[in-house]
Amino acid sequence: IRHLQQFLMELGKGYAFVARQQRISTETADFFIDLVFYNYILKCFVLIDLKTSKLTHQDIGQMDMYVRLYNDLKKGDDDNPTIGIILC
């Protein structure tokens, strides 16, 4: 995203950029999350999946998997549950 600062401002207060195309690995596969932010007001990670096509049930299932993996592998004990957002 070229205009990252503008994008963050549109999200609202408290967002900090963490990663772009962050890899999450399991024993059998690697997955890549388009954008990862941390909201220090909400105390949680926010995962964003960018889609260029119509939203499908598979997209929703994929985001659910990303959120569960992120909660298991990255979220700290003091963090609130991860939020997943799909932008079409």
Task: Label the model's feature ranges.
Residues 1-88:
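Charged, terminal alpha-helix-loop-beta segments
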